[in-house]
Amino acid sequence: MRAAGPQEVREWDELIAQNPDGGQILQTRAWGEFKRAHRWAPRYLLSDTESPIAVLVLRHSVPGLGVLGYVPKGPGVAEVMQLPALLDGLRDTAAPAFAIKVEPEIEQSAAATSALRDMGLEKSRHDVQISRATIIVDLRPGEDALLASFKPKCRYNIRLAQRRGVTVSPVPLDDHSIDTMYSLMAATRDRAGFTLRSREYFALYWRLHAAAGQGQLFFASLDGEVLAGVFATYI
């Protein structure tokens, strides 16, 4: 495992897209720089394997313990047996970290869990990311086929919203749209009772990924009133 050079860092998002897992938004350069603003130090690394794998490692100082290494949604392997070639390199480059947390996007199974244990990995007691699973949807069949695959109640609700005039549109990311989106999130927090980070936290996250061409804000509206929103990320 070696540090990426200046040109490789500039081309970082192209490199992670070539990883076996196809790339993860939390392995992008925008995410690394976003976390830098929140006291994590990003390190951009490349494996010494025959086909190099690009790995973003975040380092954070934990009082009383030392440095924690964190590989969000990575390293970018597609199969569990691709991990051993990377782990020793990660341990060396993350030193003197007291622990390294990895989150490879591999399919969960009893065999995979056993193999991870054999590599010396242990399931952490707390998940960093809220989502514990990834759903992969093949978009190639087209909109009609995707809609047909939904449950009848879901299709009914979508068509009902369309008949009533609800529209979904991309919107520019500016102070007004950020305020609107954050207000929607705060209202949802109040109903559901979950923890929500500050407006400034999300504003920086959205702005960095939008500037990198990796994010777009969408609003669902009816008669000029915004009903819902989502910031979609992509590589």
Feature locations, PLM:
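Conserved residues at the C-terminal ends of beta-strands
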Residues: P72-G74, E103, T233
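Alpha-helix C-terminal capping segments
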Residues: L45-D48, G89-A95
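A generic structural signal for short coil/turn motifs at secondary-structure boundaries
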Residues: A78-M81, R191
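Conserved acetyl-CoA binding element of GNAT-fold acetyltransferases
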Residues: L65-V77, A133
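Conserved acetyl-CoA-binding loop-helix of GNAT-fold acetyltransferases
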Residues: V80-R91
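A conserved beta-strand-loop-helix scaffold within acyl/acetyltransferase catalytic domains
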Residues: A3-T49, I53-L65, E105-S109, S114, ...
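Conserved GNAT acetyl-CoA-binding A-motif
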Residues: A95-I106
